[in-house]
From Swiss-Prot:
Its EC number is 2.1.1.177. GO terms for molecular function: rRNA (pseudouridine-N3-)-methyltransferase activity. It comes from the Archaea. It holds the Pfam family SPOUT_MTase. The keyword S-adenosyl-L-methionine applies. It is an enzyme of class 2 (transferase). It is found in: Cytoplasm. It comes from Methanoregula boonei (strain DSM 21154 / JCM 14090 / 6A8). Keywords: Cytoplasm, Methyltransferase, rRNA processing, S-adenosyl-L-methionine, Transferase. GO terms for cellular component: cytoplasm. This is Putative ribosomal RNA large subunit methyltransferase H. Belongs to the RNA methyltransferase RlmH family. S-adenosyl-L-methionine binds at residues 76, 108, 127-132.
Amino acid sequence: MQVRIIAVGKIKERFLSEGIAEYTKRLSPYLKLSIVEIPEEHRGTRAPAGQEELAKEKEGGRILAAIPERAYVVALDLRGTEISSIELAARMHDWQLAGTNTIAFVIGGDLGLSDAVINRAAFRLSLSPLTFTHPMARLILVEQLYRACRINSGEPYHK
């Protein structure tokens, strides 16, 4: 199975980059992971709401262009469904049994995801009711993917 994480913005904090690199390495026996970083749309510090919406739409267009054809799309969204690690593992297993070869997880920038991206998603996932920075959400996602792979392989994992 292939997993593509499509995220707006670059990781600036070294500790997050190192954590993501570590889990990417750990995931390699289980799946092929690629991460695509979409440039943030530049806007003024006090941009009017209309300009922010336009920026979100432009980012959304770049996200949609990065989604592989026929990929199962999961949008990380505060209004999405909260699931446990075991439920994520079960869903990934089910998606694979249904013939899904590629899963695309999308993470928006500070403006969130455009309506077009949300509408393209087959599933909306909330990592937590807590608020995370988008780079932190990326680290949590790759850790949870690793945990799901361990669960599906019948290997021990921290509970």
